[in-house]
Amino acid sequence: LTAITLDDVKAYAKTLYEKVYITGMIHGNWSDKEAMQSVDSLLSALGSKPLPENERFEQVVEVMPQGERFRFSREVADNNNSLAYAIQVGEKDFSLLAKASMIASVVESDFYTQMRTNQQLGYIVWSFNQRIEDRIFFRLVIQSSTHGPFELSKRVNAWMASTEKLFSKLTDQEFERHQQSLIVALEKKGDSIGAIAGDLYSLAADEKGDFRFKKKLIQAVKDLKKEGVAKTAGKIFRDDSTPRLEVLMRAKGSKEKVPEGVITETKKFKNQLN
């Protein structure tokens, strides 16, 4: 950034809209004709050419091979260590997405209590399911100024091994409470025209026009059985064939030894995936 001058920015600004690809969502009391007129006005004002499909941004999700476990580590210019765990759950599927969401709801409190309250590993402790494009992941994140990333990894792996007890002790009433909580969250509508427009935009763009996406997911949550959720949790947390990636960031000046087999260059990681 230090090499960029104001003149560079001004020159680039003139070419910024030469070619564009626009995704939009219009929500409100406009007619189809008024909506099209608005779009035409925008395109006319920009004076742009269409951006070719092969030049448009597309988020590419790398797929980890079955049974593979990757560990990547690097020292950073920060006083904190961190562990970011990404467990590859599978391809987008309403049933699998519902199960992953339910599992996230069940483990959230226990993971936080064990990692932050009981073991006091760090201030930031998160667990959540995540969908990127057509892939579902389960994420575990800890930031710590007192424990190195490889120690964090040991603690998290021990916690994952203990999740069998967490799900075997889950009562029908607790399961139904988590289930109902998810349904209520999915059924909640935006409380402003902007929030509603944002939800509709996500359905139009991210879900490719599937405006019944939430209803389908709600039905998938309603169809869940405790045994099926527990089985999927076992595959996510305790099955050696489930692919996973650990990103272990070491604080500046860290003396923690990097174990053998840990990748320290992004290029090597990419090569192992291909």
Regions found by a protein language model. Give the residues of each.
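C-terminal regions of mature proteins
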Residues: 1-45, 50-65, 71-77, 86-90, ...
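Long, C-terminal catalytic modules of enzymes
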Residues: 130-137, 149, 153, 164, ...
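Active/ligand-binding-proximal structured segments within catalytic/core domains
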Residues: 95-107
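Extended amphipathic alpha-helical segments enriched in small hydrophobics
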Residues: 140-172
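A structural supersecondary motif
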Residues: 82-88, 104-144
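Short, conserved charged micro-motifs
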Residues: 32-37, 93-97, 147-154, 257-258
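Short, solvent-exposed amphipathic alpha-helical segments in soluble enzyme
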Residues: 40-45, 102, 157-158
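Short, solvent-exposed loop/turn segments at the edges of secondary structure
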Residues: 17-19, 77-82, 98, 133-135
